[in-house]
Amino acid sequence: MKNSLLLYAEDETNGEASTCGRILIFLSWVLVVLTMPFSLLVCFKVVQEYERAVIFRLGRLMQGGAKGPGIFFILPCIDAYARVDLRTRTYDVPPQEVLTKDSVTVSVDAVVYYRVSNATVSIANVENAHHSTRLLAQTTLRNTMGTRHLHEILSERMTISGSMQLSLDEATEAWGIKVERVEIKDVRLPVQLQRAMAAEAEAAREARAKVIAAEGEQKASRALREASEVIGDSPAALQLRYLQTLNTISAEKNSTIVFPLPIDILTYFMKSKEAFVPNA
């Protein structure tokens, strides 16, 4: 019984509001007719190709959704409208101090590209869609970075940007906002951490250089051993190497006089050494 009385009271209130609204609309039309043609300057409005107009009549959204682009008509005194820009906007997220998952404090900033996808919803569902989106972008940046390790933040920016874009787009859909893109601009580390990372990188480079030098010396010693074996097995190769050495020494501009030993004597000494080693 009580619910029936409440429903009856609501219907009666709506009926009275509807009757009052019809009277005000009629009076507004009378005002337009009486003030012709000056009223036309007030009644006709123009919105651009990239804009839409959300019209309220007596505080209620008009049927048919947002108007535009082009000319639309409003009644004076009872109609109000809001222009909504549909173009893509950019928002530079200010640097946010974030504590990463491995307890490192970093400063991160980003840029967000977004636009209004539903003009009516962006006006009716939220007081200031742009301001709300910007605040949400800051909190989303902090929350996303707080779940990542430092090496992930430095090496997986594209993945993190995509994750932020999906989170923002899902949250702002109820506001009539479409988040098109999110980009991580810069990740600033503490000075002490930068120095430690630079020292670590320098030590790693020095270690790699030492390994490469050791491998080079090993290959060179192996090549020298193989060359000495070839020269020892071939007297002609020994003589050719001897002549190359004499040619190199004589080509240098110095005052040193070199008296080369005959190759036969060198061969004799080498054979004597080979004969001495087995006897030992």
UniProtKB/Swiss-Prot annotation:
Q: Which SUPFAM superfamilies match?
A: Band 7/SPFH domain (SSF117892)
Q: Where in the cell is it found?
A: Membrane
Q: Which UniProt keywords apply?
A: Membrane, Transmembrane, Transmembrane helix
Topology versus the membrane, per the UniProt entry?
A: Single-pass membrane protein
- Extract one GO cellular component term from the record: plasma membrane
Q: Which CDD domains match?
A: SPFH_stomatin
Similarity-based family: Belongs to the band 7/mec-2 family.
Name of the protein: Band 7 protein AGAP004871
Q: Which organism is it from?
A: Anopheles gambiae (African malaria mosquito)
Q: According to the entry, what is the taxonomic lineage of the organism?
A: Eukaryota, Metazoa, Ecdysozoa, Arthropoda, Hexapoda
